[in-house]
């Protein structure tokens, strides 16, 4: 289940699921929980995935992917896996960690591991969304944000896209202050 930390003077923490869902809804960020128990045990917490294993993960969550795609107009999806065994992990993270926005939604479903989206709220204040297996988030178009890994430095996520072009960032000049 996701938690939120607001970058305010109190570093406000939101941990209860109803409050997390309400806060994200107020920010127009889609948040859902999908049944992670559907994932076969041999794919759980596995970070070196073959293309066949990635396709199996997509097949497991096909109903959910098709549902959100029909509601939001998404056209394609893939699986990304990052861990300390990923070649050039630090270089990849530098790209993800640069503040940016997109002209479409950025959608991620966490299959294994953890991730953090840092998002600019409607009032201009940034907040972290710490995601865990089973969490789906959709950052709306044109919202400044970036993604990073948590301390374990590993994640497997389904990425869902509006277009078949996939992840196309528009980088910002200003950086987020934590």
Curated annotation (Swiss-Prot):
Cofactor(s) the protein needs: Fe(2+); Ni(2+)
EC number: 1.13.11.54, 1.13.11.53
Site (May play a role in transmitting local conformational changes): 105
Entry binding sites for Ni(2+): 100, 102, 106, 145
Protein origin, superkingdom: Bacteria
Keyword Lipid biosynthesis among UniProt keywords: no
Record has Ion transport as a keyword: no
Quaternary structure note: Monomer.
Name of the molecule in the record: Acireductone dioxygenase
Species of origin: Bacillus velezensis (strain DSM 23117 / BGSC 10A6 / LMG 26770 / FZB42) (Bacillus amyloliquefaciens subsp. plantarum)
């Amino acid at each position: 289940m996701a938690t939120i930390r607001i970058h305010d003077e109190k570093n406000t923490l939101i941990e209860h699921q109803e409050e997390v869902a309400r806060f994200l809804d107020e920010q127009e960020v889609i948040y859902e929980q999908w049944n992670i128990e559907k994932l076969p045990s041999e794919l759980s917490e596995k970070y070196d995935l073959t293309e066949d294993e990635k396709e199996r993960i997509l097949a497991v969550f096909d109903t959910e992917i098709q549902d959100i795609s029909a509601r939001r107009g998404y056209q394609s999806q893939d699986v990304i896996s990052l861990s300390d065994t990923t070649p050039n992990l630090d270089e990849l993270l530098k790209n993800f960690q640069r503040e940016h926005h997109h002209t479409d939604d950025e959608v991620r479903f966490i299959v294994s591991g953890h991730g953090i989206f840092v998002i600019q709220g409607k009032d201009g204040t940034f907040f972290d969304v710490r995601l865990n297996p089973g969490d789906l988030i959709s950052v709306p178009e044109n919202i400044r944000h970036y993604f990073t890994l948590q301390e374990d430095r590993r994640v497997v996520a389904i990425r869902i896209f509006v277009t078949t072009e996939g992840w196309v960032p528009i980088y910002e000049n200003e950086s987020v202050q934590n």
